[in-house]
Curated annotation (Swiss-Prot):
GO biological process: response to hydroperoxide
HAMAP family, alphabetized: UPF0246
Name under which the protein is recorded: UPF0246 protein NMC0835
Recorded family membership: Belongs to the UPF0246 family.
InterPro entries the record matches: YaaA (IPR005583)
Phylogenetic placement of the source organism: Bacteria, Pseudomonadati, Pseudomonadota, Betaproteobacteria, Neisseriales
Assigned GO CC terms: cytosol
Organism of origin: Neisseria meningitidis serogroup C / serotype 2a (strain ATCC 700532 / DSM 15464 / FAM18)
Amino acid sequence: MFFVLSPAKNLNEKDPAPVSEFTQPDLLAESDILMQQLRELAPQQIAELMHVSDKIALLNAQRNAEWNTPFTPENAKQAVFMFNGDVYEGMDANTLNTDQIQYLQGRVRLLSGLYGLLRPLDLIQPYRLEMGTAFANLRGKNLYEFWGDIITNLLNDTLAQAGSNTLVNLASQEYFKSVNTKTLRARLITPIFKDEKNGKYKIISFYAKRARGLMVRYAAEHNITDPEMLKNFNYEGYAFNDAASNESEWVFMRSEQIK
């Protein structure tokens, strides 16, 4: 069983990682191709392409200019500690122990517009390139065309090497669209997190993102290898709802008063 997650736009570049172990991204040669093109963009072009402020555009122009290989602990940081959004706050990898970090490294993969597919301890340098960005490149009009089947093939190889046949999709639609489900050789399970608001259960983005990270933390803390055991996930008041679920979409609900 493997999990896939989206990355985060917010990055924690300052705080040192709590572990020294690191690996290198498998698709770094592809990242280098993209970065060569990104470096050609002026800050104003970045602002228009990514729909960001001038300040953020300038920051990322500087990041692109400084991006260089090889990655080392001195110029890069492990992805799971660099990403700093809602998902990663829910996961809170900084407070996991060594065995739990190894669980993440062995069973979690992070999708990325620039890096394709990452292990949690893969070193990355700061960047901003969301998968849905309409960034024309030498392979097509966007990043989905750039990555093609590269991400899916690596996922299939990863699953095969581990003898696993289940992929738990905790990524956003924007990112999971980079995976070709027709050629993915795995059973696909997509957890859905709903919160009660005014008497109705609905997906609330902030809570759903945090819950994805919480589920990965739950799996790591309980060393879960059987997907069925994920149905026992109960962090922060969530509970599996069998009636609302089906074979591929597992719904977890949380009542309003529990938060």
